[in-house]
Amino acid sequence: MFSIFKRRSVQAALAASGLVGGAVFYSDFIKRPAPSHFNPQFTPFTKSLAPPPSRETLLKNVEDISKFDVLIIGGGATGTGVAVDASTRGLNVCLLEKTDFASETSSKSTKMAHGGVRYLEKAVFQLSKAQLDLVIEALNERANMLRTAPHLCTVLPIMIPVYKWWQVPYFFVGCKIYDWVAGSKNLRASTIFSKETTVAIAPMLDDSNLKASCVYHDGSFNDTRMNTTLAVTAIDNGATVLNYMEVKKLLKSKDNKLEGVLAIDRETGKEYQIKATSVVNATGPFSDKILEMDADPQGEPPKTAQFPRMVVPSAGVHVVLPEYYCPPNIGILDPSTSDNRVMFFLPWQGKVIAGTTDKPLSSVPTNPTPSEDDIQLILKELQKYLVFPVDREDVLSAWCGIRPLVRDPSTVPPGTDPTTGETQGLVRSHFIFKSDTGLLTISGGKWTTYREMAEETVNELIKDHDFGKALKPCQTKKLILVGGENYYKNYSARLIHEYHIPLRLAKHLSHNYGSRAPLILELYSKTDFNKLPVTLADKEVFAPSSDASSDKSVSYASFDEPFTVAELKYSIKYEYTRTPTDFLARRTRLAFLDARQALQAVAGVTHVMKEEFGWDDATTDKLAQEARDYIGGMGVSSDRFDVKQFEVK
C-alpha cells in the first residue's frame, strides 16, 4: 500500500510540476515578445577601421602623462573590467599586466555566465540570505553580460538527468525557484523531459535507470575573448592598457602613501616610473603578492615566500573532449559527484568541457598544470552517465585554474596555512580591502560578476579620492562592448553572403569577433596566404582554391580548426598579440580545444609573427619553445607529441 501511495504521490507531484512548468513556459517563453534584432539590410557593416593605439604609443603615454587618475595592476577579468568602468566615467586610466590578458585564472573558467544555481540550494536549506544575495547578484550580472556582449555570450540549456523518482519534483521545484528568483532576468522557463525525450536529445546517456530530466538555462561564453574585448574597449575609451608590463615595486611617499609603481617592459627591459592618484590591486589569486609589497616600507617584494593571507586558493581542473560526449546545444549537470561536488559537461566551441575538481592549495602557482589524478577523476564521473567507454585518449586538452576564495587579510595572522581549515571570515563573493597606504585590493568573485565588482571598485575610488573633475555615473550596464555594436543573431549568414566563406568559418568569426569579423575577412580576402589555416602557414601550399588541378592547393577540409593567417594578423594589429602563446591560447582557444592541433600550429604562427614583428632567430626560437612548453602542460601525454616535426622551418 505504501509503495502504491508513494508512486501515486510522485506521479501527482510530477503532474503538478508539469502544469506549473507548462504555465510558466507559456508565460515566460511563448508570450514573451520576440527580441528585436537589427535588420541586416540597414545595419552598418564595418569593413575598415583605424587600429587602436600601438604598443609604442601606449608606452609613450606612460612616459608623457605625469600622473594617472587610476593605475590598475592586473589584466584579468576584474582588472580590465575596472579599466572599462573607470575610463567610461572620465578617469584617466593605466592598466599593467605582467604577462598577457587572461593569462591565468580568467582564461581557465568553466566558460559559464551562470546565476549560481549551486548557491540556491544552500540558500533554501540553510535559510541563508547571504547565499540568496549571491544568486540574485549573479542572475542580474548574467543578464548584463548577455546584453553587453551578445556575440560572446549565449543562452545554454542545462539538463539534469534524474535516476530516482523522488528527485524529479525535487530538482524541478529547485529549477522553478531559480526561474522565480531571476524574475524578469530569467532566460527561459525550466521544464521537464520524459525519459524518451531525454534519450532522444542526449543518446549518449545511460538510460538503464533514467526516470526523466530537468532542464534550466544559464549563459555560456568565451572567457579570454571577453577579457581581450574588455581590454580593447577600455583602450577605445582612452585607457592606457599594456600587457607584458610587470610591476616590480610600489612607489611611496614619506608618509607611506602610495604614489605609483615602478614597472618594467618585459619585452625591452626598460623601466618606467608611473605616478597615479589611486592604485588598484586586481591580481586575482596573486593579490597577496601585491599586498606583501604594500606592507614593505620601500614597496619591495618579500625576499622569502609567504602564505597567502587574503586569498584561500584551490585548484580546479577541466578537460576537453570530442563533441560526441555531449549534445551539441545542451549541457549536462551532475548534481552530486562522489565527493559531493557538482560537475558540468558542456558543449563549447565545437567540443565538450568537463569539470571541475576542487583541491585546496597552500600557495598560488604560476600557470599550474592538471594532474593525471584530477583528469581521471573527471573521466570517472563522466563514465557514470555514458553508455560508451570513456577513453583517456579522447582527452584533447586539459587545464588547471586557481579559484580564489577570499577573506579580510587584517583578520589572518601572518604564517597561517590556508589549507589548515581556517575558514573564519571567508567571503564567498568578492571582497574589497583598503590598505593604510591607499592601495585598494579587489579579489574573489567570478567571471559573471566582474562588472559589478568593477563598479563597486570605482565607486570606492571616487569616494576616497578627489580627482578634480566632474565624472559620469557608471556606464557599464548599458555599454556595448567592442564587437557587440550592430551585431545580430544571424550575423554569420551575412558574412557568408558577403565573402563566400564556409559556414564554420563564418560562425567562428561572428561568435568570437561579432561586428568586427569583417575586418578579419577583409584581410582574408587580400591575399591567398592570409586564407591559409595557421597550421599550414609555414608550408609550401596554396590557399583554398577551385582549381582542383593544383596539387598544392588546400581544400577547406584541411581546416581542422577555423583559425586563419588573417585572424592572426588581425589579432596582432587590433588586439595586442605579442607571442605565439597569446594567439594559440587566448586570442583563439586552439590550445584549450585541441593541444595536438595547437602544437602543430606553433611553427606556422611563429613564422607569420616573425615576419610581422621582424624577430631575429633567437627571439623566434625562444617564443616558439615557450608556446610548446605551455601546450605541453595541457593534459595530453608528452609521448603523443612528436615535437621535432613541428619545429620552425
Swiss-Prot record:
- Gene3D superfamilies assigned to the protein according to its UniProt record, in alphabetical order: Alpha-glycerophosphate oxidase, cap domain (1.10.8.870), D-Amino Acid Oxidase, subunit A, domain 2 (3.30.9.10), FAD/NAD(P)-binding domain (3.50.50.60)
Name the Enzyme Commission number(s) assigned to this protein. 1.1.5.3
The residues listed in the UniProt record as binding FAD, with positions renumbered to this chain, are 69-97
Q: What class of enzyme is it?
A: oxidoreductase
Transmembrane intervals: none
- Extract the Pfam families matched here: DAO, DAO_C
GO MF term set? glycerol-3-phosphate dehydrogenase (quinone) activity
**Pathway named in the protein's UniProt entry:** Polyol metabolism; glycerol degradation via glycerol kinase pathway; glycerone phosphate from sn-glycerol 3-phosphate (anaerobic route): step 1/1
InterPro entries reported in the protein's UniProt record: DAO_C, DAO_C_sf, FAD-dep_OxRdtase, FAD/NAD-bd_sf, G3P_DH_FAD-dep
Q: What does the UniProt keyword field contain?
A: FAD, Flavoprotein, Mitochondrion, Oxidoreductase, Transit peptide
* Cofactor(s) recorded in Swiss-Prot or TrEMBL: FAD
GO BP terms: namely:
glycerol catabolic process; glycerol-3-phosphate metabolic process; glycerol-3-phosphate shuttle
- Cellular component, GO, one term: mitochondrion
Chemical reaction(s) catalysed:
a quinone + sn-glycerol 3-phosphate = dihydroxyacetone phosphate + a quinol
Question: Where in the cell?
Answer: Mitochondrion
UniProt family annotation: Belongs to the FAD-dependent glycerol-3-phosphate dehydrogenase family.
State what protein this is by name: Glycerol-3-phosphate dehydrogenase, mitochondrial
Q: Which gene encodes it?
A: gut2
